[in-house]
Amino acid sequence: MACGFLEMEILNTFWEISSINEDKDISIQDVVDGLANIGIERAYTTIKTVMDRLVSKSILVRYKSGKKFFYKAAMDKHEMALDMLHEFTDNFFGGDVAKMVRFVENESSHLLVK
């Protein structure tokens, strides 16, 4: 499942907040503040829109507590990485893991330079 730059920044921030306090209900404002801490300034409404998109992709789950909505991860970072790796392998190597591994081995010197 493809994710854009802002979606990935939101997810990484979300997972970071979750790892610090597993019992915390995570709000949109928590994510807005977390992003601001790493220099990403976006409007509350922008973050809400992207988080709702992540809900529609079944990556986050939204629930209501009192009058506020909160979010939790439907996928942890490891599950998401595996899902993206499978998608990458399917899209670029026809699902052939051996081809993908050979590609990475052949390009590893270029990858290490960056």
Predicted regions and their residues:
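Short alpha-helical segments that sit at the start of domains
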Residues: 1-22
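Short acidic, hydrophobic short linear motifs in intrinsically disordered regions
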Residues: 21-35
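Short, cationic-aromatic polyanion-contact patches
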Residues: 65-85
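Amphipathic alpha-helical dimerization/coiled-coil segments
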Residues: 83-114
